[in-house]
């Protein structure tokens, strides 16, 4: 495939990377973490590639030249399989073809050249008949009644499942061609044994996947669906059942019949053998699926295994890498911690004797007495710089609003100002008959329950998440998809999602046997508390902004807000990511290529991920804002570490101000958490989030460039390090997956640490072809020499003891 990719010139005008004068491809910018061969692959073969580790189905060859005035020749036979060890691949039709024709299968190689030309023309010119309207709007019959009933599904009118419904009846998954230039996340690595997986087989290898138009499928359930589709199509080809009317499940437009006589016996046996192999793989996957687990849990367990391997490798490189790995593992993998709970002090014992009959943290505030509809300021709060504030708020619909400037201009009322502006912008006050004085009273009361002395999880963060959610709701891909009630629920959930945050983590509250942890049984402690406070404040005087909603609307909004806020628990990150990626990829390989979002489960899943993306959006903002957020979160972490030190507790990862590697933590945070999430969101709304991904890449590059490069330690230091090795850290994951291999369970490896008093830091994160970012040539050579003399000995970050 590498030879194919490099020998065929790119079609002029077929891609942004091609110049306008001919087929010569421009080199990819240096900051893009991809090879350049994808510019040279012809657009006549759009396809999805599916990744699973054990077998390989050969790709379709390019179409043969057609003699003039003669019928097309028989379809070419599949090429021989790739060399051993290649990543298993499966092919399905492109997103562009799929959306245009509502579902070609992976036997697209049998289509006539004319059909391929139409596909290529549609991709290159953007001309797609039937999709002139917004790509994700409801059909015309919904425009007057486009309300989704949370309890009963879609409202009266044409059902999205109606075969006569236009392709715009839902969220249409677009072909992701531009995305192929960008480095993919670790999710696209092979799930085979990490140590036996060569670099060339990674997602970013020119051999494995550097083909223009590829889209790799990594979730197991979507892989099974695509493989079964391959089996179905191969069976049809082998048995001459191609003339059969296409089923609803597998529509085949203009697929020519294949005469068995035109296939040699050897090729026939080969195709039959590959079909049987494909079916065996599907059966193996389905046998591991337990009835009590969802199909997305297959993806969640797979992603956790892969992240565990990445973190284990990262932890072996240095103490700072080990600390970053611990932080990511403890925060985002929903691990169960065995901790020694310290004995409570006498003051704490007396405090715990108080009854738990009321929600803690709710204060009695009076904002309504001075507010009337006639005297409410323009932006809800009094400010002497109203005109300057108005200028800043002109960007409320744009990504990267300077929320710190708004906090300064509004007298530290950014949440009230931004929420009021968004409600006015979206006309929610009129739609739900919300009195403006009631809205301002509630918002000011809510904002007062965010702690001003908490560095990160305060009212500014809440305002930032609200505004980010507002922008994501406005993306062209989601135009007219969500109802006004769903929009209100998402914005309200964003506003309350961190109210009364104490500035410490859930695990800290659990470890200290806090009252909140007892009340919520150690399960999403803070998230449950935020919801309780947010809804409790609605009961305060003149604070019920939902007073004019019907009973059913209130129940639906409460249900959605609860589901959204609980999903902001970072320990649920992997499950949330797996759910979304499974949903997106499953629709890519099914017949429609259209995400209908015709049930509550799918719709709330998108909203949950939207707010989760907004909550993890700091690295996607302009660098100036991102750095301020980083300083704030590290300050909050260090304060928690100081409290843990005072109590004699083990200091949480990244919370020890004496040895935390801030720059490396941000690179790891982006590589293993933020990038995979935003990459999946960008697939969902493609191409609307491409600028966000570009900013994320630039910010990662900046933090990577600021990591001090480590010189190799002196021989004496090396000897001292070998004598002073500390306790080794090992990652362990408990997956709810029976039949997991021993290599998967024992994939965690130990790290050897050096206690030399060096301030150096070794950069080690995920790269496009390996999990290690190379240093400059001199340092890299020294590191290799050191590794030969003392295997697996890390470079210490400082002389302080490890946490």
Swiss-Prot record:
Protein induction: Up-regulated by cAMP and follicle-stimulating hormone.
Subunit structure: Homodimer for the long isoforms. Isoforms with truncated N-termini are monomeric. Binds ARRB2. Isoform 33 is part of a ternary complex containing PRKAR2A, PRKAR2B and AKAP9. Identified in a complex composed of RYR1, PDE4D, PKA, FKBP1A and protein phosphatase 1 (PP1). Interacts with PDE4DIP. Isoform 5 interacts (via N-terminal region) with SHANK2 (via proline-rich region); the interaction is increased in a PKA-dependent manner. Isoform 33, isoform 4, isoform 7, isoform 8 and isoform 9 but not isoform 32 and isoform 6 interact with SHANK2. Isoform 31 interacts weakly with SHANK2.
Tissue expression: Expressed in epithelial cells. Isoform 33, isoform 4, isoform 5 and isoform 9 are expressed in brain. Isoform 33, isoform 5, isoform 8 and isoform 9 are expressed in heart (at protein level). Isoform 4 and isoform 6 are strongly expressed in cortex and cerebellum. Isoform 7 is strongly expressed in cortex and testis; weakly expressed in kidney, lung, spleen and cerebellum. Isoform 8 is strongly expressed in lung, heart and liver. Isoform 31, isoform 32, isoform 33, isoform 5 and isoform 9 are widely distributed.
Annotated region (Disordered), positions in chain: 1-103, 338-358, 705-724, 732-803
Protein name (Swiss-Prot/TrEMBL): 3',5'-cyclic-AMP phosphodiesterase 4D
InterPro entries per record: PDE4_UCR, PDEase, PDEase_catalytic_dom, PDEase_catalytic_dom_sf, PDEase_CS
Gene3D superfamilies named among the record's database cross-references: 3'5'-cyclic nucleotide phosphodiesterase, catalytic domain
Covalent link (Glycyl lysine isopeptide (Lys-Gly) (interchain with G-Cter in SUMO)) residue numbers: 382
Regulation of its function: Activated by phosphatidic acid. Inhibited by rolipram.
Acidic residues bias (residue ranges): 774-789
Organism: Rattus norvegicus
Functional summary from the UniProt entry: Hydrolyzes the second messenger cAMP, which is a key regulator of many important physiological processes.
Family: Belongs to the cyclic nucleotide phosphodiesterase family. PDE4 subfamily.
Gene that produces this protein: Pde4d
Binding site for Zn(2+) 2: 498
Residues modified as Phosphoserine: 137, 294, 296, 343, 370
One term under GO cellular component: myofibril
